[in-house]
Amino acid sequence: MKLVKNENNKKPESVSDEEAREAFIKILRWIGEDPTREGLLETPKRVTKAFKEYFKGYQEDPKEILSKTFGDVEGYSDMVVQKNISVQSHCEHHMAPIIGIAHVAYIPNERVVGLSKIARVVEGFSKRLQTQERLTVQIANTLMESLDAKGVAVTIDSTHQCMTMRGIKKEQATTVTNFYLGQFKDDLSLSLIHI
């Protein structure tokens, strides 16, 4: 699996699909299963394929997604809000799923981005091992910098399986994070808008 550089600008050591499958075979043995039984013969291959999908964000550059913008919007300069963007991620501590929604708003500075691009940025950062706090900040910072926006606001509301299926087991617990930049942070009336 080919990976992009991490935040420390270091490229992780590459691991082949075969090495990943071998690791999953060991995990099956570790939990007490027989990886040679009929129902599990293809499991290491399937899990390797699933992990490629779960963590495809390591192969994407969200800033590149935002490289094409549009200026012909007839002077539109007010807030653009995209709500209920699906978030499917995994916590970096237990690799347990994080399922939720993101609401993203930005105030353009003469140029706007295609609406699907906002959702793609959310997905690009979501498809990595994450903390919700970092995910919220990464989305906001990337939009602010790439679009030269006047302001960005990001809210994520999600359920963490590491809290619902293990440990404290609080099935109804959700986590909400907010991050404001530019005019959203500076203008109290804008920061009170619950996107």
Where are these regions (language model features)?
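Histidine-centered catalytic/metal-coordination loop motif
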Residues: 92-137
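Short, low-complexity, polybasic intrinsically disordered segments
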Residues: 162-191
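Beta-strand elements of well-folded, non-transmembrane domains
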Residues: 89, 108, 158-160
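Beta-rich nucleic-acid/ligand-interaction surfaces
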Residues: 44-50, 157-165
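Active-site loop/lid in soluble adenylation, ligation, and acyl-transfer enzymes
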Residues: 2-98, 183-185
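Structural motif
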Residues: 77-80, 103, 151-153
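Conserved small/polar residues in nucleotide/adenosyl-binding loops
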Residues: 193-195
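Well-ordered alpha/beta subsegment
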Residues: 123-159
